[in-house]
């Protein structure tokens, strides 16, 4: 297969093993853990050009390129990562990973539990938080010999991780890019997550999370959970333009099977997702979203939480994103401005809703490229650091 000129091409994931115990916010300890990682580009001599990519709820380490010659689909953010793209791999060394609790190679519910005869953790896997993820990412940074990230970048739940980095490790990143995100979930967002979780928990095939041991899988519950989530990722206008009230067969069938194109789309998305994602992981990821609130330890003051940050910020929102509306990004911006922190903010007119952050929207790409800068900017920041 001939890959596009601006693709990173074939990539091979790497597994990093950490033998030291990981103490989690929930009070439990993972005796050891593994992280699945992909890297793109080349780390320069002084290790000043490294960018960390943090993934969203259903994301993973495969952010760009292809795993096989016959792959039809590239990594989840291939539109922005590659030679000459917004995150230019000719200039930057890009690191993407699958967080713990995930189901794409890092230690999670499907991994063997050393304290239970190496049976899958299943529901015994501890609940993890965004702070736990950032802690493991910092450990990965140490393993790679990267003391300071040039930038930490993320969209949605990934943006929350980037924001947590700026609070927990203010001396270890120069730039923070928070896209289509929020400083904490609203009651409405927590409600959406609870409906998704109940869809899984109430599936008879869930077996209290021990479905692998029972040779079953809560497919129906996971399909419903994804359908609910997908509705919130798209804007009303995007759904109107994509589907309208179009019928699959062109006429009413007067039944409960699929009739409207939007129904067909949601069922297809749910079906595809259920084949590739673990139900226990979905539960863990949504709880991590619910728990995220960096202001909680600062008297519930986001302004106070952001007071010790030292990096430059780019905050991006999208006009039709109603899952994490622009007003939520503006809360972050206001807290930074109050603290006299360097921040750039852009609310981009886009019709794709929350999923806009995954698309190569021209102004979005241009802004991201400009904020990250290029080789000349890397030289100047390296001189400043020395």
Swiss-Prot record:
This is Homoserine O-succinyltransferase. It is an enzyme of class 2 (transferase). Its main location: cytoplasm. The gene is metXS. Gene3D superfamilies: 1.10.1740.110, alpha/beta hydrolase. One of its GO terms (molecular function) is homoserine O-succinyltransferase activity. NCBIfam families: homoserO_Ac_trn, PRK00175.1. Substrate binds at residues 226, 355. The record marks 323 as: Important for acyl-CoA specificity. Disulfide bonds: none annotated. It comes from the Bacteria. PANTHER family: HOMOSERINE O-ACETYLTRANSFERASE (PTHR32268:SF11). InterPro entries: AB_hydrolase_1, AB_hydrolase_fold, HAT_MetX-like. It catalyses: L-homoserine + succinyl-CoA = O-succinyl-L-homoserine + CoA. Homodimer. Keywords: Acyltransferase, Amino-acid biosynthesis, Cytoplasm, Methionine biosynthesis, Transferase. Belongs to the AB hydrolase superfamily. MetX family. Residues 49-358 form the AB hydrolase-1 domain. GO terms for biological process: homoserine metabolic process; methionine biosynthetic process. Pathway: Amino-acid biosynthesis; L-methionine biosynthesis via de novo pathway; O-succinyl-L-homoserine from L-homoserine: step 1/1. Pfam families: Abhydrolase_1. Its EC number is 2.3.1.46. It is found in: Cytoplasm.
């Amino acid at each position: 297969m001939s890959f596009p000129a601006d693709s990173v091409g074939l990539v091979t994931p790497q597994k990093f093993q950490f033998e030291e115990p990981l103490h989690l916010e929930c009070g439990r300890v993972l005796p050891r853990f593994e992280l699945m990682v992909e890297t793109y580009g080349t780390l320069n001599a002084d290790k000043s050009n490294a960018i960390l990519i943090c993934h969203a709820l259903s994301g993973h380490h495969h952010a760009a390129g292809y795993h096989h010659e016959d792959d039809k689909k590239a990594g989840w953010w291939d539109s922005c990562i590659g030679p000459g793209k917004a995150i230019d791999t000719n200039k930057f060394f890009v690191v993407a990973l699958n967080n713990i609790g995930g189901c794409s190679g890092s230690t999670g519910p499907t991994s063997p539990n050393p304290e239970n005869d190496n049976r899958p953790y299943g529901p015994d896997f501890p609940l993890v938080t965004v702070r736990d993820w950032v802690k493991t990412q910092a450990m990965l940074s140490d393993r790679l010999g990267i003391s300071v990230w040039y930038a930490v970048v993320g969209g949605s739940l990934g943006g929350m991780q980037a924001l947590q980095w700026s609070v927990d490790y203010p001396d270890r990143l120069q730039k923070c890019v928070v896209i289509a995100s929020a400083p904490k979930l609203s009651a409405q967002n927590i409600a959406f997550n609870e409906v998704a979780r109940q869809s899984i928990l109430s599936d008879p095939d869930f077996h209290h999370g021990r479905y692998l041991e029972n040779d079953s899988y809560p497919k129906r519950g996971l399909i419903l959970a994804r359908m609910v989530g997908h509705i919130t990722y798209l804007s009303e206008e995007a759904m109107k333009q994509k589907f309208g009230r179009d019928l699959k067969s062109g006429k009413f069938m007067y039944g409960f099977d699929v009739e409207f194109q939007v129904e067909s789309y949601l069922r297809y998305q749910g079906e595809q997702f259920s084949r590739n994602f673990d139900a226990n992981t979905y539960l863990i990821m949504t709880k991590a979203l619910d728990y995220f609130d960096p202001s909680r330890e600062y008297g519930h003051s986001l302004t106070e939480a952001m007071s010790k940050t030292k990096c430059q910020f780019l905050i991006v929102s999208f006009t039709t994103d109603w899952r994490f509306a622009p007003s939520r990004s503006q809360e972050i911006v206001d807290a930074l401005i109050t603290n006299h922190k360097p921040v750039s903010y852009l609310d981009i007119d886009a019709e794709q809703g929350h999923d806009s952050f995954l698309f190569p929207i021209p102004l979005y790409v241009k802004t991201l490229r400009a904020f990250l800068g290029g080789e000349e900017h890397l030289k100047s920041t390296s001189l400043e650091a020395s």
